[in-house]
Regions:
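Charge-dense, helix-prone N-terminal extensions
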Residues: 1-121
Length: 121
């Protein structure tokens, strides 16, 4: 049984509860994921919105002053020519976005699509 109580919930409440300083960034990321993989499912897992289609694609996490787009289990294999992805784990990587101007929509969309495609292999 899930001890968190939110596992599998819809993500609307999570987005609504965000601080006004980061909510617009999170909303843009959510929209980006939905456009990149329209048939991905969105639900709360581990307290944060997760996106799946035939396996994990990505998650959106929040910090005090940023929103992170997180990739695992293929985070380390994503093409990252600008070195934006952070993390030291075996597979997971994330990028922190502090303002809407930091959104690299084309690159992030590419990563999201790479993650979704990796699940088909």
């Amino acid at each position: 049984m899930n001890e968190r109580g939110d596992y599998g919930d819809k993500a609307d409440g999570w987005f609504a509860a965000l601080d006004d300083s980061i909510a617009p960034v999170a909303a843009d990321l959510r929209s980006l994921v939905r456009k990149a993989v329209p048939d991905a499912t969105e639900c709360i897992k581990w307290g944060t919105p997760n996106y799946e289609k035939d396996g994990a694609i990505c998650a959106i996490r929040s910090g005090k002053e940023f929103v992170a787009l997180q990739f695992g289990p293929i985070g380390t294999s994503l093409e990252d020519p600008d070195g934006l992805l952070e993390g030291t784990g075996k597979a997971m990587r994330h990028v922190k976005i502090r303002a809407k101007t930091d959104l690299k929509k084309q690159l992030f969309s590419s990563w999201i699509k790479q993650a979704a495609t990796a699940n088909l292999k």
